[in-house]
């Protein structure tokens, strides 16, 4: 099964997450199929905190990829900001 989830990056105490499409059996920060965007939880007011490639997200959902609950929440946040 293919899932859309967060892969952690960044340094200690400075988290940065990539939104990736990966096989469910792989490790959280392991191999992934495609990077769809990023989430920066500690972004300042003048920095972009979330970016998602909507066209690729739509494609992966159409072929059966399921998003994790956290990614679902981030997608809805990004949609609210865009509107």
From Swiss-Prot:
BP GO annotations: translation
Pfam families: Ribosomal_S16 (PF00886)
Keyword field contains Iron: no
Record keywords, A-Z: Ribonucleoprotein, Ribosomal protein
Gene3D superfamilies documented for this protein: 3.30.1320.10
GO-annotated cellular components: cytoplasm; small ribosomal subunit
Molecular function terms from GO: structural constituent of ribosome
InterPro entries: Ribosomal_bS16 (IPR000307), Ribosomal_bS16_CS (IPR020592), Ribosomal_bS16_dom_sf (IPR023803)
Family the entry assigns: Belongs to the bacterial ribosomal protein bS16 family.
The protein's name: Small ribosomal subunit protein bS16
């Amino acid at each position: 099964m293919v899932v859309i989830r967060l892969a952690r990056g960044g340094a200690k105490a400075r988290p940065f997450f990539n939104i990736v499409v990966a096989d469910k059996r792989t490790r959280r920060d392991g191999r992934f199929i495609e990077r769809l965007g990023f989430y920066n939880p500690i972004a300042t007011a003048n920095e972009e905190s979330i970016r998602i490639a909507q066209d690729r997200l739509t494609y992966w959902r159409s072929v059966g990829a399921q998003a994790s609950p956290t990614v679902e929440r981030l997608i809805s946040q990004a949609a609210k900001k865009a509107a």
